[in-house]
Swiss-Prot record:
Pathway: Protein modification; lipoprotein biosynthesis (signal peptide cleavage). One of its GO terms (cellular component) is plasma membrane. Its EC number is 3.4.23.36. One of its GO terms (molecular function) is aspartic-type endopeptidase activity. This protein specifically catalyzes the removal of signal peptides from prolipoproteins. It is found in: Cell membrane. Pfam families: Peptidase_A8. NCBIfam families: lspA. It catalyses: Release of signal peptides from bacterial membrane prolipoproteins. Hydrolyzes -Xaa-Yaa-Zaa-|-(S,diacylglyceryl)Cys-, in which Xaa is hydrophobic (preferably Leu), and Yaa (Ala or Ser) and Zaa (Gly or Ala) have small, neutral side chains. PROSITE patterns: SPASE_II. It comes from Mycoplasma pneumoniae (strain ATCC 29342 / M129 / Subtype 1). This is Lipoprotein signal peptidase. The chain crosses the membrane at residues 23-43, 88-108, 110-130, 156-176. Keywords: Aspartyl protease, Cell membrane, Hydrolase, Membrane, Protease, Transmembrane, Transmembrane helix.
Length: 184
């Protein structure tokens, strides 16, 4: 009598299916390229703008202005909108956990669209995590202010935000495609 497949055997089968050659090579190339570009830009912008930050991050410095975006440099010990600034352990945990979950989903992704957006999410979160870890003060450097707003973001925050929007739109497109196929 055949044994029923266990949870782990099903999981292994899904992992192997989602990571077969040559798809795996394209997947890894996309992940490494997008991840490198995001982390490189995060740290290049930090290096370029770190000297512009006010003393201990208390005062921001207005670096450049345009009609769409301004560069205003400030340190931020919290997550988005300076939430949890007084709980650094929770901030590290949330950013690390978000990165781990995103990287976990990458293992099972078979769509280049999802791979791109999940990679952008994972490395945006990792960019903030490593930025905070290497800053010496436990803060990220925020510098983008979009017109009509008062909130200050960095490139990693933008990657996280755009990846959630991209994933949502990808899910909607896939949902409507599947709905259309079931009707015909």
């Amino acid at each position: 009598m055949a044994k029923a497949p266990t949870f782990f055997s099903k999981l292994l089968k899904q992992i192997l299916f989602a990571n077969r050659k040559p798809f795996l090579y394209y997947k890894l190339a996309l992940i490494l390229f997008v991840g490198f570009v995001i982390l490189f830009q995060v740290f290049m912008l930090r290096a370029a703008l770190n000297g512009e930050k006010g003393i201990n991050g208390a005062n921001g410095t207005d670096v450049a202005r345009s009609s769409f975006i301004s560069i205003y440099v400030i340190g931020n010990k919290g997550v988005g909108f300076s939430l949890l600034a007084d709980q650094p352990g929770l901030v590290y945990f949330l950013q690390g956990f978000l990165s781990f979950i995103a990287l976990f989903f990458l293992v099972f992704s078979t769509s280049y669209n999802y791979i791109f957006w999940i990679t952008t999410l994972a490395f945006g979160s990792l960019g903030n995590f490593f930025d905070r870890l290497t800053s010496g003060s436990g803060e990220v450097l925020d510098y983008f202010v979009f017109s009509g707003g008062n909130s200050v973001f960095n490139l990693a925050d933008c990657c996280i935000t755009f990846s959630f929007i991209g994933l949502f739109l990808s899910f909607l497109i896939q949902f409507f495609k599947e709905m259309k196929q079931t009707k015909s």
